[in-house]
Amino acid sequence: MEYKNTLLMPKTEFPMRGNLPKREPAMQEKWAEMNIYEKVQEHTKGRPLFVLHDGPPYANGDIHMGHALNKVLKDFIVRYKSMTGFCAPYVPGWDTHGLPIEQALTNKGVKRKEMTVAEFRKLCAEYAYEQVERQREQFKRLGVRADWDNPYITLEPAYEAQQIKVFGDMAKKGYIYKGQKPVYWSPTSESALAEAEIEYQDKKSASIYVAFPVKDGKNVLEGDEKYIIWTTTPWTLPANLGISVHPELEYAIVKVNGEKYIIASELFETVAKTLEWENAEVVKTVKGSELEYTVAKHPFYDRDSLVMLGDHVTTDAGTGCVHTAPGHGEDDFIVGKKYGLEVLCPVDDKGVLTEEAPGFEGLFYDKANKPITEKLEEVGALLKLTFITHSYPHDWRTKKPIIFRATAQWFASIEAFRKELLEAVAETKWVPAWGETRLHNMVRDRGDWCISRQRAWGVPIPVFYAENGDPIITDETINHVADLFREHGSNVWFEREAKDLLPEGFTHSGSPNGEFRKETDIMDVWFDSGSSHQAVLEERDDLQRPADLYLEGSDQYRGWFNSSLSTAVAVTGKAPYKGVLSHGFVLDGEGRKMSKSIGNIVVPKKIMDQLGGDILRLWVSSVDYQSDVRISDDILKQVAEVYRKIRNTFRFLLGNLDDFKPSENTVAVAELREVDRYMLVKLNDLITKVKEAYETYDFAAVYHAIHNFCTIDLSSFYLDFAKDILYIEGANHEDRRAIQTVLYDVLVALTKLVTPILPHTADEVWPYIPGVTEESVQLTDMPEAVQLDGAEALKTKWDAFMTLRDDVLKALEVARNEKVIGKSLNASITLYPTAEMKAMLESINEDLKQLFIVSEYKLGGMMEEAPADAPKYEHTAVVVVQATGETCERCWVVSETIGKDAEHETLCERCATVVKENYVK
């Protein structure tokens, strides 16, 4: 008889190798065929809503690791919520207006100047839709479950119509105004930028100290002094109209080399060192407030420079006397306005100086620095020129420096509802908690929001102008434009004349002849995406405002979190979200930013093609995503190894349940052995821990808990000793069915617990599980932790056993290394434990040699009675010797009962009995 045929070895068709790059697309096709998104919505209908609102990625190019991290995190949450009593719809979105699409078309050779704005915009829309399609397929490949057939797209007419309504509501409340004000201006984009569209990079700039002679000392100064200013933007000096000093600072009149200079007293030493003054003496001091209204002379124009008071003046750098050009700085503008100065801005849209800067007209601003510095030197006003490298704002799209420039722009007045904004921030739940401080400070400190852009591809600002120049924004015009956009899309604005965009028969006192103009500026793209709470959450039947959660990268505090908050509070008085969660950026394995120049870019598509979407998702679950995270081949290799461990666990569980019918073979909990009940206690602990981790969005805790459970609780302990029962005993042996009962509970729970993170794998496992009826694990709920009777006492006892078992394993390892035994089944062990452990061992009814995986187990005396040469550990001394007897051909246990049964002379007594009872006819 072939005894190996009498072993109940694991049997399953569940493949050992994941082969995810091939298997996942097939699984996704299956999901599409069964309409999994709709099925889940149907299954969860009537439950409380949980809305995670998708911040729209920009529709341009392939998705990058940041996109993957973001969408997968969202998917974890939505999947978990739909398995824990919520209906969790997920509507993906795309941001589709703005400069990058215009640039992409230009790069493709589109001749912008040779077509009408409307024609160019049609090409932009086509391109945007192509990009949406491209990204949609890549997001689907990640396994993200969403309403992919009904996303929201900011260029769609219904969306644009709602955005116009948001603008109209804000205008009605008096929050929208047109004003001349310095704004961030990008000469390369020829447009104003919002704060969210700038990034800081190092730039080399001229650093100059310039003397402004006093023209009128107002009886405070004698008139022969000179104010010293410091600037790193010499090109703004043609726009200088004043000097700001701080009212509370003390200013020194310093005599040196026959000249008298005015600087802040506390900066005297620094300035003296920089300007290499020797023997400089302070001849007089005055308070800043006394210098108000003194007048200096512009260094190279026949023009006054008024001395004004400003709280923005600091002693961090410079001289305490600040060059003030109201057309080129926010503080300058505010101070200038207070003192009635004009807003002089001698720079055009392209960054070129105009005739208002005589002597420098026609020069690009950055190229004007040198001739202006030379002019200062020529007139004797330049005291020092050096070059510094400093952090300077750049256009986030063109990567080129930007300037502050006063232009006529449309603004949303943040000041008008700042108090409500700050209250809304305080009422929101922020994860991480520092998010609250970050947004609070941004809202507290930000100026009014410049919402106009001088571009073609965007939503037009729905404003008309009367013949007398009055802007027209009324309920009637707003509603009419919104209706037109809903019917025809916003291109209609560029296809029709102003009169054809106004309601029929519209009149206005400022247009006696019935003539009207329309605004040509478009809205900031942050106003587009920032209106999604109205256009999506409020408009869709399956969603609601406020959303439960917004989840984006930490750059969105100044972006989407901010713009959404501003428009929502302006229109509804409340935040559009109850909670905000942010994640960090994805860096390479060494913690460097990914860039083409370094060549360290990791692409999601490559990972999915080589390893699979579930590996990428498992990586997302493994990292501390609230900070910046790292990814590399080595890191992915480690994650793939963890995946292999989890997959093998599933395969082992399935293999050993091949002959298990839950309805027939399940053993009642009360009839399980203690060790089996202990395993159920461990399983319930896992369920509790994992669900708590999901609830708090701590996915790394989910990852570690599941990995540890598979490797430590199952593989290293329970499954290890269970093999001797599962394979060796007869099919219906009570211990075997008891273990299978536990394995079944573990398998079902584990499959559900990993579903949000590994949906492809979980749905691959699901149909192999005996007795399941649901079409997909996604249509089930998370397992519930069951409180077993006496669970705490059981846990205490068996946790103690596990620590003692560690001592035994160490002793067996030593014996193996010393060649006393070959493998643990060759061993006979005698334990000399502590009193506490001895009592615990004596209370165990299970076969301890099975639990220790040895051939013979004896309990000796107390620890102090152990032989002198016996290795002593924390809880026991252990004597390991070679077991006496022969090795059983069937179970490999060393036993003196081999051959006792003449018919089965190579088997131990136990195996002979099993064979006779189950396999001998």
Curated annotation (Swiss-Prot):
Monomer. Catalyzes the attachment of isoleucine to tRNA(Ile). As IleRS can inadvertently accommodate and process structurally similar amino acids such as valine, to avoid such errors it has two additional distinct tRNA(Ile)-dependent editing activities. One activity is designated as 'pretransfer' editing and involves the hydrolysis of activated Val-AMP. The other activity is designated 'posttransfer' editing and involves deacylation of mischarged Val-tRNA(Ile). It comes from the Bacteria. It comes from Bacillus cereus (strain AH187). The lineage of its organism: Bacteria, Bacillati, Bacillota, Bacilli, Bacillales. A motif ('HIGH' region) lies at residues 57-67. NCBIfam families: ileS (TIGR00392). GO terms for molecular function: aminoacyl-tRNA deacylase activity; ATP binding; isoleucine-tRNA ligase activity; tRNA binding; zinc ion binding. It is found in: Cytoplasm. Disulfide bonds: none annotated. This is Isoleucine--tRNA ligase. A motif ('KMSKS' region) lies at residues 593-597. Zn(2+) binds at residues 888, 891, 908, 911. The keyword Ribonucleoprotein does not apply. It catalyses: tRNA(Ile) + L-isoleucine + ATP = L-isoleucyl-tRNA(Ile) + AMP + diphosphate. Coiled coil: none annotated.
